[in-house]
Amino acid sequence: YNLDGKSFANSFQVEANYNIAEGFNTRFAYKNYDIQTDYTSGKLIKPLTPNHRFFANVSYETSKKENDAQWKFDITYNFIGEQRLPNTASNPIQYQLEEYSNSYSLLNAQFTKVFSKKFEVYVGGENLTNMRQKSPILASDNPFGNNFDTTIVYAPIFGRMFYSGLRFKID
């Protein structure tokens, strides 16, 4: 990026946790990044770093029964703000990007059935909003050309994913 000068990074984060009721918890967090670098073309925000991030989580656990059996529910929301993209102005028009990416949101969830201290079954999903970055590879139609670039990934490239599993605890 032709660094010619100084760079700096400032960040601010605030987090709040709140127990709404027995077993019902929330967590919220906000993070702000201000990362800039002096380039030969002037001071610019660091590419592919969102200035704003927001996180929210809601979880609920039922009361434990015999053998510690219970249900657990967890939902997480993430907001990722716009990010400055590397300068592609000198590329041919079909390989030029906007100056900034779009902001986006992600939603994840997991549900767990606890049968005992030693055995659990869970099911969940990630990226339930199915957010995907369009064209994560620049000039993918010309992989041996000068404009081919796989480094400009600022958002998920896979859609929603589901999973399930078992947990066994061995004493």
For the regions a language model picked out, list residue spans one by one.
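Outer-membrane beta-barrel transmembrane domain signature
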Residues: 80, 88-90, 96-108, 114
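Surface-exposed coil/turn segments at beta-strand junctions on protein surfaces, enriched
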Residues: 19-21, 49, 102, 114, ...
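Flexible, surface-exposed loop regions and adjacent strand-edge segments
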Residues: 33-34, 42-50, 89-96, 134-147
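Flexible, active-site-adjacent loop/turn segments at secondary-structure boundaries
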Residues: 1, 46, 102, 126-127
